[in-house]
C-alpha cells in the first residue's frame, strides 16, 4: 500500500532522535557509511533533507567501502546520481575486505572480522575527509535485535548507544534513524523509489542476527508494541547513553502507545 508521507514521517523520527540525543551541532561534517542497502541510502537522504528543518547548517558526505566480494567491483553509479541530486558528495573506496575475509582468512565467523575491517576503514576515511562525526544506519529493529542477542548469547544487558564517542579517533558515531522501525525505513525508500545496490556477501541472510530478526518479527505478530516496549526498557534501564538528553522527553512515553510515535512530524 502506497504511503506518500513515508519519507516525511521518517525524517520526523530522525529529527526527534537528533534532538533528543543532541546528535548534530552547527558546523558538523558528517560522513555516512553507505553500503548501498535501504538503511544507509535512506539515512543519507534523510540527513540531507533535515538541514532544512534543524535551524542550522552542517555538511553531509557519503562514502562506500566496496568489499569486492569475488574480486568484483560493484557499480554504484545509481547512488552517485541520487546523492548528487541532494547535494551530497559521494566517494567509493575499493577495498580487499571481501577476499581477506572469505579467501585468505576463511573465517568460521566472517561477520565479526568483516565488521572490524569495515569499521576501521570507515573511521579512517572519515578522518581523511575531515569529518568529526560518522552516521550509521541502525534503526529501531537493529537496537531491539542487538539487545536480545546480547542477552541470549552473552548473558548481559546491553546495546550500542545512540551516540558513541571515539576519543582516540576524534570521532563521534551517531545513529539518527534509531527511533524508526525497519518497516518505516523500507516504506520511505519504496515510496521515493530510491535505487538500492543489493548485497553480494556470501553470508548474507544466514547470520545469527537474521535468526534474531525472525524472533522479533514473530513476537510482533502477537504483540504490536514489542519493539516500543523494548525501546522503553532501554531508555529506562540505565544503559549508558540511552536516556534522552532532554529531561522528561522520552521517545516512547508509554509502551501502551504501540506503534504510534510521539512528536514525529516535521
Q: What feature does the model see in each segment?
A:
Residues 194-266:
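The feature marks non-catalytic terminal segments
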Residues 115-126, 163-169, 216, 220-236:
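Short, basic, helix/turn surface patches
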Residues 22, 26, 156, 160, ...:
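Residue-level signal for secondary-structure boundary elements
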